[in-house]
C-alpha cells in the first residue's frame, strides 16, 4: 500500500497535537480524496461498511425498530425501541422522523416492518446511509449484531470524489487510530478500479481541528 503505517501514525499525532482542547472528546476523522473517478456512472459510486479493528472509541447510538421477540431482545440490551405503532406515528410527523434519523448512528429492524420503514423513514435514512440492519422477527439475541455495529463505520462515495470516515476518538492510542485508518483506506482502495493510483490525498483531523495531510 502507498501509505506507510508510520506516516499514518505521524499524521494522527500531529492532528491531535494541533487540536485545541475542547470540553468534549473529539472524533478523529479521515478524508480520502480521489481522482479519475467518474461519479456520473453509478457503478463508480459505493457504500461500504468497515469494521474498525480497534472500535470507534465511543458507543454508537443504536435504535431497534421492532415488536415482539426482537423488541424484547433489544430491551434486554438497554437499546431504544421504536414499535410498529410508533413508526406509524412518525408518518404523520416528518419533523420527528428527521430528528430520529439524525439522533441514531445505526438502526436494527425486524423484517416485517421494512416496507413501512421504507415508506416512512426511507427518505431520511437513505441519504444519511443509515438504512437498518434487517433481522428475522423471531430473533432473540441481538448481541452479536450490536457488538459488530459498535466497531463499524459506514462510508459512501456519492456526488463528490471524497470519502469521509470517523476512525476513533482523540483519547485513543495513536497506533490504534492509524490501524483503524488503514482498515478504512484498504476498504476504499479495494473498491477502486485502479486501486491506490486513484487516491489523490489523505487528511486526518479532529472534529474541530485543522486537517493534516498524510505524507506518502
Curated annotation (Swiss-Prot):
GO terms for molecular function: rRNA binding; structural constituent of ribosome; tRNA binding. GO terms for biological process: regulation of translation; translation. GO terms for cellular component: large ribosomal subunit. Keywords: Repressor, Ribonucleoprotein, Ribosomal protein, RNA-binding, rRNA-binding, Translation regulation, tRNA-binding. Gene3D superfamilies: 3.30.190.20, 3.40.50.790. Belongs to the universal ribosomal protein uL1 family. Binds directly to 23S rRNA. Probably involved in E site tRNA release. This is Large ribosomal subunit protein uL1. It comes from Thermococcus kodakarensis (strain ATCC BAA-918 / JCM 12380 / KOD1) (Pyrococcus kodakaraensis (strain KOD1)).
Amino acid at each position: 500500500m502507498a501509505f506507510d503505517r508510520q506516516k499514518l501514525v505521524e499524521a494522527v499525532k500531529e492532528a491531535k497535537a494541533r487540536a485545541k482542547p475542547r470540553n468534549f472528546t473529539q472524533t478523529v476523522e479521515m478524508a480520502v480524496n480521489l481522482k479519475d473517478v467518474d461519479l456520473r456512472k453509478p457503478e463508480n459510486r459505493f457504500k461500504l461498511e468497515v469494521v474498525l479493528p480497534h472500535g470507534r472509541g465511543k458507543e454508537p447510538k443504536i435504535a431497534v425498530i421492532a415488536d415482539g421477540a426482537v423488541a424484547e431482545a433489544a430491551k434486554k440490551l438497554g437499546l431504544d425501541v421504536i414499535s410498529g405503532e410508533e413508526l406509524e406515528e412518525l408518518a404523520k410527523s416528518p419533523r420527528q422522523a428527521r430528528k430520529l434519523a439524525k439522533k441514531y448512528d445505526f438502526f436494527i429492524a425486524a423484517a416485517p416492518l421494512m416496507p413501512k420503514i421504507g415508506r416512512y423513514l426511507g427518505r431520511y435514512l437513505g441519504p444519511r446511509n443509515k438504512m437498518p440492519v434487517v433481522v428475522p422477527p423471531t430473533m432473540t439475541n441481538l448481541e452479536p449484531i450490536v457488538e459488530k455495529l459498535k466497531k463499524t463505520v459506514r462510508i459512501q462515495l456519492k456526488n463528490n470524489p471524497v470519502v469521509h470516515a470517523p476512525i476513533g476518538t482523540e483519547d485513543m492510542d495513536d497506533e490504534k487510530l492509524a490501524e483503524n485508518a488503514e482498515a478504512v483506506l484498504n476498504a476504499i482502495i479495494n473498491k477502486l478500479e485502479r486501486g491506490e493510483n486513484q487516491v489523490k490525498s489523505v487528511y486526518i483531523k479532529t472534529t474541530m481541528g485543522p486537517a493534516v495531510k498524510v505524507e506518502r
